[in-house]
Amino acid sequence: MTDDLTYIVTPDPVPTGPQLWEVTNTGTHHSHHVILNRIPDDVTAADIVADFGSLFSGTPPAGEPLVAQFTYVGYVALQSGGYTTWNAFNLAPGTYAVICFIIDPATGEPHVLNGMVTTFTVA
């Protein structure tokens, strides 16, 4: 997690099975958390930003929102800049997304609307 609102997920692809993630907020200006979801294989980070943009604007997308197709996998607690946590996950093969919903005090918007979402593959 960084001040420019990005996640860096390594290695690529992430291996399947039980694992321990080191999650570090390398930034100094923003606190972040991680919401880890399994997502449909064809969904992109841009799709997720657009879907949540519709939901947060008060105009839900036509039909079922994309988030209804997500499967919650885990959470990494709120971290201030410069801190590291260790988190255990057991991941099956597929496509995943890490998303931050912390509100930016300057804009009043959640970080996801500023692009803080990364998709990755577990294989």
Language-model region placement:
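Extracellular/periplasmic metallocenter environments
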Residues: 2-6, 11-16, 22-34, 70-123
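Contiguous segments within soluble domain cores/interaction surfaces
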Residues: 18, 25-59
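Subset-of-secretome marker
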Residues: 51-77
